């Protein structure tokens, strides 16, 4: 939980080694990188808004990690965190994002015309398609550190901007605190709304303070374009629909996102972005594009195949269970998406998903016929 600077000053009365957390049983990126020497060097620092090293690492201290999934173990509290604590963040970013160096520059491409194909993924296998990203509004602290007033100001700004969308993007805002328990649960079950703040990662980072104050969901009339407000990021922008037309989903995503950015600019606000890290978000795992393009895909045979994980790795894809991270695949249905966020453009990431999913379907069809898939094994992308 974010503490005041006064409390951080009090901690400095103790020697650095007395304050260093016990990370001996941890499996996360932060624990891998943070040394007592680095801690001693950074512990007295804070960003202009007062975010400290302890605030950055607390979620990773409290959540040692998952035996099979390497969690990140740290968060940013404001745009300046990535610079103030770069000795910690840079190696984590390099480790998490496939060797992305502090000198590398990120590229952005939100032109859906540059996507090749993607409008014909077989709906017998692809049940739904979805593209999401996050955006942070410059000048405000991020959710682990923002005050109630900041959070409410972000909500007000976002709702004003979104209410100007028209055509097939026109919709309305639903504040969490004005929903009934049943309405919330229905939206969560239908994969439209973020979960209640039960995740220890969310709780330990301070993101769930004052819940549900100033949180909510905005969506268009047919629920194909959604914006979550003040969950893990200021904004999460989502385009989704049933079936396999990823091109249509991505086109709506790009158009909506571009319009939202223009609306914010007209109110003299911009999104946090820099040439090195791309779009700045709360979790280092989402830096760059913040983009996750995914499909719910039926792979009952390939999902049981010993080479499934290797195939995904070579295609730079990752799988989750039907209900998201840490859930089981029900009825052979997996959530398959791009593994990368940083160092590739939005179009490149969606292209990897489109091309990869076509190959996964081809492999599934082979296995249905009882045939081998060895000759279809892809090279490492």
UniProtKB/Swiss-Prot annotation:
InterPro entries: ATP-guanido_PTrfase, ATP-guanido_PTrfase_AS, ATP-guanido_PTrfase_cat, ATP-guanido_PTrfase_N, ATP-guanido_PTrfase_N_sf, Gln_synth/guanido_kin_cat_dom. One of its GO terms (biological process) is phosphocreatine biosynthetic process. GO terms for cellular component: cytosol; extracellular space; mitochondrion; plasma membrane. Coiled coil: none annotated. It catalyses: creatine + ATP = N-phosphocreatine + ADP + H(+). GO terms for molecular function: ATP binding; creatine kinase activity. Dimer of identical or non-identical chains, which can be either B (brain type) or M (muscle type). With MM being the major form in skeletal muscle and myocardium, MB existing in myocardium, and BB existing in many tissues, especially brain. Interacts with SLC12A6 (via C-terminus); the interaction may be required for SLC12A6 potassium-chloride cotransport activity. This is Creatine kinase B-type.
């Amino acid at each position: 939980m974010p503490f005041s600077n006064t409390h951080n000053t009090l901690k400095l009365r103790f020697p650095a080694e007395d304050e260093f957390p016990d990370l001996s049983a941890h499996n996360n990126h932060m624990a891998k990188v943070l040394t007592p020497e680095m801690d001693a060097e950074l512990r007295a620092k804070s960003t202009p808004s007062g975010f400290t090293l302890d605030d950055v690492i607390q979620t990773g201290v409290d959540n040692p990690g998952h035996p099979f999934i390497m969690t990140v173990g740290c968060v940013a509290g404001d745009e300046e965190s990535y610079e103030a604590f770069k000795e910690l963040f840079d190696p984590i970013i390099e480790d998490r994002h496939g060797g992305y160096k502090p000198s590398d520059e990120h590229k952005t491409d939100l032109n859906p015309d540059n996507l090749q194909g993607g409008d014909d993924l077989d709906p017998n296998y692809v049940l739904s398609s979805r593209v999401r990203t996050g955006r942070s509004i410059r000048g405000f602290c991020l959710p682990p550190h923002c005050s109630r007033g900041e959070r409410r100001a972000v909500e007000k700004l976002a709702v004003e901007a979104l209410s100007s969308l028209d055509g097939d993007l026109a919709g309305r805002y639903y504040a969490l605190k004005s929903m009934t328990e049943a309405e919330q649960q229905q939206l969560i079950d239908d994969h439209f709304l973020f979960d209640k703040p039960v995740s220890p990662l969310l709780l330990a980072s301070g993101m769930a303070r004052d819940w549900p104050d100033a949180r909510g969901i905005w969506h268009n009339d047919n629920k194909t374009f959604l914006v979550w407000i003040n969950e893990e990021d200021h904004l999460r922008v989502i385009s989704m629909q049933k079936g396999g037309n990823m091109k249509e989903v991505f086109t709506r995503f790009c158009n909506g996102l571009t319009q939202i950015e223009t609306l914010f600019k007209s109110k003299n606000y911009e999104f946090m972005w820099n040439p090195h890290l791309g779009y700045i978000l709360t979790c280092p795992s989402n830096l760059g594009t913040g983009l996750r393009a995914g499909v719910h895909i039926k792979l009952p045979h390939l999902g049981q195949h010993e080479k499934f994980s290797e195939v995904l790795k070579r295609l730079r894809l990752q799988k989750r269970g039907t209900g998201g991270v840490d859930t089981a695949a029900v009825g052979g249905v997996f959530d398959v998406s791009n593994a990368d966020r940083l160092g590739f453009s939005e179009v490149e990431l969606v292209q990897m998903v489109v091309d990869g999913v076509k190959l996964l379907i081809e492999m599934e069809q082979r296995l249905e016929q009882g045939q081998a898939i060895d000759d279809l094994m892809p090279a490492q992308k």
